[in-house]
Amino acid sequence: YELQIDFDRLRKAIGDEYVVLFSPHYFIANSIDLSKYEGFVINVARYDEINELYLVSDIIMTDYSSVFFDFANLKRPIVFYMYDYDLYQSRLRDFYISLDELPGPITRTQEELEKCIINIETEFPKYERKYEDFNKKYNYLDDGNASERVIKEIFKEAV
């Protein structure tokens, strides 16, 4: 499998300010050698709890994974890297939601991705309204009271 991201180039572009926690799809996780990127890219494919990785992440960069739904609860930047969107849509499947609803920039080239990460502090505010709308629509139950609602629902007949 050939990665569609050049980590050497990314490192040059964004410098040592970031460490990439790379979670490849399980189909390819064992076929990727990231040893030459030690200190910059860490393969976290075998890490059991992705929610813990969200907590230590400043930005999430994803393609078509649904991870952004959970990450959006943190109200941190989400960058979509859809280098093969046309192929993905025509041969595999459509996306979960309309691209217009995505709470972050869509990048299609490595150059766009790099620029977006470098300028994240000015890019992220441009998506504030979409972010709010996205969370209202898809994460509205994540208000700190979800467990209480579940307990009440389970035990409502017992009370």
Residue ranges: model-predicted function:
Residues L21, Y26-F69:
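Donor nucleotide-activated moiety binding/catalytic core segment of transferases
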